[in-house]
Regions:
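Hydrophobic beta-strand positions in extracellular immunoglobulin-like domains
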Residues: 60-62, 256, 459
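Short coil/turn segments at secondary-structure boundaries
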Residues: 72-74, 124-128, 169-171, 215-218, ...
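N-terminal, active-site-proximal structural segment of metallo-dependent hydrolase catalytic domains
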Residues: 82-177, 183-200, 297-298, 410, ...
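Eukaryotic intrinsically disordered and solvent-exposed regulatory patches
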Residues: 30-33, 42-47, 64-68, 91-100, ...
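Intrinsically disordered, low-complexity domain-flanking/linker segments in eukaryotic proteins
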Residues: 2-35, 229-237, 260-272, 343-359, ...
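Ser/Thr/Pro/Gly-rich low-complexity disordered regions
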Residues: 1-107
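Metal-dependent phosphoester-hydrolase catalytic domains
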Residues: 164, 209, 246, 258-264, ...
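Structured beta-strand-rich core segments of catalytic domains in phosphoester-bond hydrolases
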Residues: 91-108, 155-284, 289, 362, ...
Length: 469
């Protein structure tokens, strides 16, 4: 302003004075900006908490590796981000206590089931309503890990764990929190980003609470081959049967021994161990193949029957069953049978569901959520359960949803247990539809890093839990 008031003859034109003032202002502004700090030269960079509040600049300079002079480089290109914000955290969910049964044994354990959405399926084409950065595996894996660590379950049953991510992330990261693990991938692979990958099921367990006694792997494709051979003998086409039945789904089953100090003392006194059988599965998803879903569930149950025949062992069967309450598969699991008039039995192109009487099992399986919330076909009145009552379907007492996208809203995931040997004493709070659809309209989003939500239950041992398996 002072310079503008000077005469033009002394300091030049007013236009030049304005330019000089602007230049000085730019120099002062530049001097106030702190210098860039190099944080990485790797091809990928995972934002750190110390980056919050700062901007990041990516600088790429082309060079010719074959050039005689190594210093011959092209013009650098740069991209500057917005200021780094704190990473959204998964919403806090609490374990809701349920009235305890005086007849149960002391000691309890928690089991979580969670479809974590494999990266190979998490695309902008599928989930375009979410910001691309929220779909990035480098973000999602940290958010999922936060949730798993926060819940601190004794046993984790995860579905859609990508094979390479089990090896280079889940296995190592969860080992830091005291988990041992077993993994079974599906029986076909997908070529993605220059390598073959596929998802599968993983079971993690706290190694100070459980020890692995035995592992079983169920490949439904192997069972399909055997079934297809029998269908040929009855006039069916083997090729047709295999095309319909071979969907690459699997199940993973483990037998664990409880390691708490009280249990060790009981084992020494009685010679019997406290064991637990845990099954984790991901059933076929296509709604046009309900016969295949039902057959896969029945095949899994037959495998569990064989284990149960060797010892009276408590069981937890969980996972993504891709079956809604009221479906034939859900009915088989919870009622031990399928109604002969169930509409899903009418679509049976291979003739594998008849007679319906063969679709049965003797295992006393019930759903953790519905059994705890419902008695005599009505929801229980309980102050402790009030936080769950409005999040479950009043007709079935199952969660209103475990999967929420723009195209689907409903329950597909479950925690089943044998009611004669285990008793649920706590259930994880369920999110509401408003929570899941907030801002983006569905899952996944910036807070929820899968299209599924996790389920968790706390169990106490029933009086028949001791066995000599």
């Amino acid at each position: 302003v002072a310079n503008e008031q000077k005469k033009e003859g002394e300091f030049g034109s007013r236009e030049n004075l304005n330019k000089e003032d602007a230049s000085a202002a730019e120099e002062a502004k530049a001097a106030a900006v702190p210098p860039w700090i190099e944080v990485s030269t790797d091809r990928t960079y995972l934002v750190k908490p110390t980056d919050v509040g700062h901007v990041l600049k990516l600088e790429i300079q082309p060079c010719d590796a074959k050039a005689p002079a190594p210093n011959e480089r092209g013009v650098a290109e740069t991209v500057v981000t917005s200021r780094v914000i704190p990473a959204p955290s998964p919403p806090k969910r609490n374990l809701v206590p349920i009235q305890k049964n005086d007849a149960v044994e002391p000691g309890s354990f928690t089991v979580m089931s969670y479809n974590v959405l494999a990266d190979v399926y998490c695309t902008t084409e599928m989930y375009g309503y979410a910001p691309p950065w929220a779909l990035s595996w480098y973000f999602r894996r940290q958010n999922i890990l936060k949730e798993l660590v926060q819940m601190d379950a004794d046993i984790l049953c995860l579905q859609e764990v990508q094979s390479d991510h089990f090896e280079d992330f889940f296995q190592g990261e969860l080992a830091k929190y005291g988990y041992s693990s077993v993994y079974k991938k599906k029986t076909a692979q997908i070529f993605s980003e220059g390598k073959y990958v596929i998802d599968g099921c993983a079971i993690f367990f706290k190694k100070d609470k459980f020890a692995l006694i035995k592992k079983y792997e169920v490949e439904f494709n192997k069972a399909a081959l055997s079934l297809a051979e029998s269908l040929v003998g009855s006039g069916g086409s083997k090729k047709e049967a295999l095309n319909r039945l071979m969907k690459d789904n699997i199940a993973l089953i483990v037998v664990l021994e409880a390691l708490d100090s009280q249990q060790r003392q009981q084992t020494q006194q009685t010679g019997k161990r406290k064991l637990l059988c845990v099954a984790n599965t991901h059933i076929h998803a296509n709604t046009d193949h309900n016969d295949v879903k039902l057959w896969q569930v029945h095949t899994l149950l037959k495998g569990l029957e064989k284990i149960a025949a060797s010892a009276e062992i408590p069981m937890v069967a969980c996972g993504d069953f891709n079956s809604t309450p009221g479906s034939a598969a859900h009915g088989l699991l919870t009622r031990g049978m399928v109604d002969n008039n169930h509409p899903e039995l009418q679509i049976d192109p291979l003739g594998i569901l008849r007679p319906a009487s063969k679709l049965s099992h003797p295992l006393p399986l019930v759903s953790a959520y519905s059994s705890a919330l419902r008695r005599d076909n009505r929801l229980l009145e309980s102050e402790a359960l009030e936080r769950l009552r409005d999040r479950v379907d009043p007709r079935t007492a199952e969660p209103m949803f475990t999967n929420c996208t723009k195209d689907f809203f409903g329950a597909l995931d479950y925690l089943f247990y044998t009611e004669d040997t285990l008793c649920p004493v706590g259930l994880l709070e369920l999110p509401g539809e408003k929570d899941a659809r907030a801002k983006y309209g569905g899952l996944p989003n910036t807070q929820w890093s899968s299209d599924h939500v996790s389920l968790m239950a706390e169990f106490q041992w029933g009086p028949a839990a001791m066995n000599g398996y």
